[in-house]
UniProtKB/Swiss-Prot annotation:
It comes from the Bacteria. It is found in: Cell membrane. The keyword Isomerase does not apply. The chain crosses the membrane at residues 25-45, 58-78, 107-127, 146-166, 178-198, 214-234, 264-284, 313-333, 340-360. Belongs to the UPF0182 family. GO terms for cellular component: extracellular region; plasma membrane. The lineage of its organism: Bacteria, Bacillati, Cyanobacteriota, Cyanophyceae, Synechococcales. This is UPF0182 protein PMT_0755. Keywords: Cell membrane, Membrane, Transmembrane, Transmembrane helix. It is a multi-pass membrane protein. InterPro entries: UPF0182 (IPR005372).
Length: 955
């Protein structure tokens, strides 16, 4: 209009052509950028030969997008026909007219619904973009940013309506909602895929009779689909009505003349579909009763089964009937009366659930709660134990002798040989001062593991291994140039390996492997009967560069014309080039362009340092690497490094490589029927350590092995991506020997066991037999006793094995009730054993023993002398260890200077619950404990061990 009024109509068509050309240019640039990113992702997955899996993921997303676009196109078509119908029937008889405050209330209501819908859809789209595998439980995701969404969207909607015209504002709001809807459906591919692929478990939940797999797979997908569809349909309806309500003549007169009969009839099918969707959502919400917790019972209780479930079923059926009555079928008579009846029943059922349920709970359930809830408590106990594998625990009753004897020492000789005296924190503190060697190296954690140094000895030596990684954040500021960060400082190097049960003469850790590069030192231990050759044979070092690790690392480009820092030797640095097979090729100009656009890094195009063999190394943090390959798995906890040789028969492993990261991956669910949340409030009702990921520390190659083949969730993903996973039996045996039950899974099982070790519903209801994790004094702080690894015997007739152990005490009492032990060796991997102590005989727990230690006159006097001399006494983790037919309590004592000194292992305190002894080493302490420093043997050395029968060897 402005162009025509100025007499410039001749320029209108060229201007329109110019705008369309710019639009096509922008679309072409966007498509080209997308193509470059797709190419890099394709090549990245190509290094693992998993392009087929990536293609299937893209096809699932494309299918979801096409389905969403079909819904969006239908909504747009309906809206366009509505607008045409509005113009055509403008002179017809109208109804539903609004005047004055009623008109204002209608405008306000429509506005609130539109903004609320946009908030919900934009929230779901945000989750779909950044946390797509959390969409199945989007309702439990925190909504801290709700006002950050409401206020901007309200302002945007108002601005659109004011600046662009009210009708156009409604259209744009609808387009925004359609965009968010499409993103949510496309990015939610994991929900639809798993829902279609998850197999039935054969376990039926007792309330509705559905298979447990429905809650694990189908329910999250159906709930999300119905919610997002309902939001889209309501948005379409409200924006369409807004365009009618907010006409200029209506706003000026504050009067809405109403809708014509044809418009009302055209609106009814859409309202009917909305009601059908709402009915389906209400029907589905009956299943939600199975994983809600109100009061005593996890899952549906008596009130849910006898009141809420029937009311929801009734409300759903009433709304379903109402939906059919809204749709203008000619064969339905007395439509208005039937609609009134259906609406009264539906609304009444919903109101009764809200208003009547608290009264029935107070008046009917509470007075007879135990009797009414007993069947449901039994269901909750069984389901929770099943969901967290507590039902497979083997329970053993033990009654330890009150006093340690020489016979116990002889029977527990293999246990004594691996008593852990070094905690991870003192060892890390020492390593960081003695073994980091340069400011840019970092030891992130110390992992407990075991290695077989002597082939003819059944038990393996327990060790702590710490990887020496490169921490670019620690580089001096002058060294943080772009070339240094991405071309020179590309990797860490080597690791340290220490026995957990010995110390050097100065109190510092012993090392089997220390230092790095050509200065790497391999040492044996005469105390343990391990030679240098044993270490060299059992722990090959080989190519020790760590390009992939625990620490977040930026992308690296290697090999290049610039040499990479390999390791320092004295005042000099040794340089090398990356020779691994992993990485995205960037040797060609078009590959460099793709990498530059992928990384938003134009400097790649003119660096001049790349060669024809150069590769781009991205996702170098091993957990991020596993998540990128299998985003449907949860990667929890710290990975740990293993150094071992893999047989040449395993073609998928590089022959010269010895360092591998083991990463624990999980499947989980919040919708396992009748299972309880964690005691700490986390909404987790099912957990399996379903996958063990092996990541090559040099080349970054990833292998995924299924460790829980009966888990229905991982079985579903195996159906979808059969080439991605291998059975655990195909893992090289040298790596399988280093698998261990992850501490994170074990902690979750311990939390649930605190209450769900009880299977009697009466005792469970009364809460008389609840356990707790005991506390101990570590340094100067009282902390919960963390699970600890020991190599011990579960019975006097069994060989020692690698165990993860957690002592447990009764709630509010310090006596020891039980141990939960997780087995990690051979065919026993993953099995849980509960060692229960007699309730009538008090067994001292860690807190009581620690109190006795601190009350001992000689020990407290010695601690005071050290304290006055300027040293800080750190009492380490108190271990409670089964030994023969008795218990042994062991606590290491460290000394360090108050101002950041090195922790040194100075003393070892031992006790059997009656007597306490402190000595310079474990052997002396045990001799003093048993019979006052006698010369009888204490078996701490392999060479001192009595012969081991072949039948006692570990598998």
């Amino acid at each position: 209009m402005l162009i025509e009024s100025m007499g410039l109509a001749c320029f209108a068509r060229p201007l329109q052509w110019f705008k369309s050309q710019w639009l096509w240019l922008l679309l072409s640039i966007a498509a080209f950028c997308l193509l470059m990113r797709v190419q890099v992702e394709w090549l990245w997955f190509g290094q693992f030969d998993w392009q087929g899996m990536l293609l299937r993921r893209w096809l699932w997303q494309l299918g979801g997008l096409l389905l969403a676009l079909l819904v969006v196109a239908t909504c747009q078509l309906w809206q366009r026909n509505w607008i045409k119908l509005e113009v055509a029937s403008n002179l017809g008889e109208s109804s539903l007219s609004l005047h004055g405050w009623r008109y204002g209330l209608g405008l306000l209501g429509c506005f609130v619904v539109v903004v609320g819908d946009l908030v919900l859809l934009s929230r779901l789209a945000w989750l779909a973009c950044f946390k797509p595998f959390d969409l199945g439980h989007w309702w439990s995701e925190p909504f801290e940013d709700i006002w950050a969404l409401v206020i901007p969207l309200s302002c945007v909607f108002i601005s659109i309506c004011v600046m662009l015209g009210n009708a156009r504002g409604g259209r744009i709001a609808h387009l925004i909602g359609c965009f968010c809807f499409s993103i949510s459906i496309a990015r939610g591919w994991g929900l639809w895929a798993l829902a279609l692929a998850i197999p039935p478990t054969g376990i039926k939940e007792p309330l509705l009779g559905g298979d447990v797999s429905f809650g694990l797979g189908q329910f999250p997908a159906l709930a999300f689909a119905l919610v997002v569809l309902l939001a889209q349909l309501i948005l379409t309806t409200c924006t369409t009505i807004w365009m009618k309500l907010a006409q200029p003549e209506s706003l000026s007169d504050w009067v809405f003349k109403g809708l014509s009969p044809r418009q009302c009839n055209f609106l009814r099918p859409l309202i009917g579909i909305i009601l059908l969707t709402l009915s389906a959502l209400l029907w589905l919400s009956r299943h939600e009763l199975l994983w809600t917790q109100n009061g005593t019972v996890a899952g549906a209780g008596w009130l849910d089964a006898h009141l809420i479930l029937p009311l929801r079923s009734l409300a759903s059926l009433a709304i379903l009937v109402f939906a059919f009555l809204v749709i203008p079928f000619t064969w339905i008579q007395q439509r208005r009366l039937l609609r009134l009846i259906a609406s009264i029943i539906g609304v009444g059922a919903i109101l009764l659930e809200v208003l009547l349920a608290p009264f029935v709970q107070w008046m009917v359930v509470k007075p007879r709660e135990l009797k009414l809830e007993t069947p449901y408590i039994i269901r909750a106990i069984k389901a929770t134990r099943k969901a967290f594998q507590l039902d497979s625990i083997t329970t053993t009753l033990i009654n330890p002798q009150p006093q340690l004897t020489q016979l116990d020492l002889e029977q527990g000789a293999s246990t004594l040989r691996n008593i852990r005296l070094w905690d991870s924190q003192p060892l890390l503190a020492t390593n960081r001062q003695l073994q980091q060697l340069r400011v840019y190296y970092r030891f992130s954690n110390a992992a407990v593991d075991r290695y077989r140094f002597v082939p003819d000895v059944a038990n393996r030596q327990q060790v702590m291994i710490t990887a020496r990684e490169l921490d670019q954040a620690a580089l001096p500021k002058r060294s943080r140039t772009w070339l240094n960060r991405h071309f020179v400082f590309t990797h860490g190097y080597g690791f340290t390996l220490s026995p957990v049960n010995t110390r050097a003469p100065d109190g510092l850790p012993d090392y089997f492997i220390s230092d790095l590069g050509t200065s790497t030192r391999l040492e044996g231990s005469s105390e343990l009967g391990i030679t240098r050759e044993d270490v060299k044979e059992a722990v090959p070092i080989g190519r020790a560069a760590l390009y992939f690790g625990m620490l977040p690392s930026p992308y690296a480009l290697a090999p290049s014309k610039l040499k990479e820092l390999d390791y320092p030797v004295g005042d000099k640095n040794i340089y090398n080039h990356y020779l691994g097979s992993g990485g995205v090729p960037v040797g060609q100009p078009w590959q460099q362009l793709a990498a530059a656009m992928y990384l938003f890094e134009p400097r790649l195009l003119n660096t001049g340092s790349l060669t024809i063999n150069s590769k781009l190394l991205i996702r170098r943090e091993v957990r991020q690497r596993v998540r990128a390959i299998a985003p449907f798995l949860e990667v929890i906890g710290d990975p740990y490094l293993v150094s071992t040789s893999v047989s040449s028969k395993d073609l998928n492993y590089e022959a010269k490589q010895n360092q591998y990261w083991i990463v624990e991956a999980y499947t989980s669910s919040r919708t396992y029927p009748y299972a309880a949340n964690l005691p700490d409030g986390r909404p987790l009702r099912y957990l399996r350590n379903s996958v063990k990921a092996i990541v090559d520390a040099y080349s970054g190659r990833v292998h995924l092995y299924v460790s829980e083949p009966r888990d229905p969730i991982i079985l579903g993903w195996q159906r979808l991506f059969p080439d991605l996973f291998k059975p655990l039996e195909e893992m090289p045996s040298s790596l399988r020997e280093h698998l261990k039950v992850p501490t994170d899974l074990f902690n979750v099982q311990v939390q649930q066991l605190l209450r769900y070790h009880v299977t009697d519903p009466r005792i469970f209801y009364s809460g008389d037999d609840v356990w707790q994790v005991p506390k101990e004094l570590y340094g100067r702080r009282q902390v919960p006793v963390d699970p600890y690894h020991i190599t011990a015997q579960l019975g006097t007739q069994e060989s020692s094995e690698f165990l993860l152990l957690q002592p447990l005490t009764p709630l509010a009492r310090p006596n020891l009730s039980a141990w939960l032990a997780a087995r990690s060796d051979g065919e026993h991997y993953g099995k849980l054993v509960l060692l229960r102590f007699p309730s009538q005989t008090p067994i001292f727990g860690p807190e009581q023993i620690q109190a006795l230690i601190n009350q001992d006159p000689q020990i407290s006097q010695q601690f005071g002398l050290w304290d006055r001399a300027g040293s800080e006494v750190v009492q380490g983790n108190l271990l409670v260890v089964p030994l023969g037919k008795a218990l042994l309590y062991v606590e290491p004592v460290y000394l360090r200077a108050r101002q950041g000194g090195l922790p040194t292992l100075t003393r070892v305190v031992v006790s059997d619950g009656k007597r306490i002894a402190m000595a310079e080493d474990l052997g002396e302490g045990l001799r003093a404990l048993v019979d006052g420093s006698s010369n009888k043997a204490v078996y701490l050395n392999r060479n001192d061990l009595p012969p081991i029968k072949a039948a006692d060897q570990l598998n």
